[in-house]
UniProtKB/Swiss-Prot annotation:
Segments passing through the bilayer: none
Protein name: Peptide deformylase
Reported function: Removes the formyl group from the N-terminal Met of newly synthesized proteins. Requires at least a dipeptide for an efficient rate of reaction. N-terminal L-methionine is a prerequisite for activity but the enzyme has broad specificity at other positions.
Organism: Prochlorococcus marinus (strain AS9601)
Catalytic residue list: 164
Amino acid sequence: MANHFSQLAKKSRTNGNAEKIAKEQSGKPFLDIYKLGDDVLRQNSKRITKVDESIRKLAREMLQSMYAAKGIGLAAPQIGINKELLVIDVNFEDSAAEPLILINPEITDFGTTLNSYEEGCLSIPGVYLNVVRPSTIKLKFRDEMGRPRKMKADGLLARCIQHEMDHLNGILFVDRVTSKDDLNKELLKEGFNEKDVISIN
């Protein structure tokens, strides 16, 4: 396992399956992933009132697209659907590890310890910057069968969940970056406009 969020997001060596979808994908993602500057990324998502086969199909397609793009997390708004749905797999090098499908996730507790870690995003390709977040969280959600679940998360998983949940509220990780010089430099290098960042610090 790599030491940085961005390194993990760049690596996808495995021969396993996840939700019957090969973790190693090649070519263009199955679904188009919206980029910084697209309005859909700034909208609040709506709760899913019924977990049915259409939601499970969407989750499978999101996983396929996430693996193809060599990511470790994807939120529905990133593919233009403003619903509270996330897919995450921080262990995609482990063929036996199952991905997480989080429906209507809600963080119920944040740990008091904060740490800074490098993040990247499939909606802002090529940009990797440090973001400060709580290192542990507790959350509740529904799984792909609609069953209520609770879990604790720490480390990379906790960070990835927080990162993807931000998307449900129209927030991107660049909005949380405190070093504006580094932010503007990275955005310019990758062809993004700093005016599309909405700082929340």
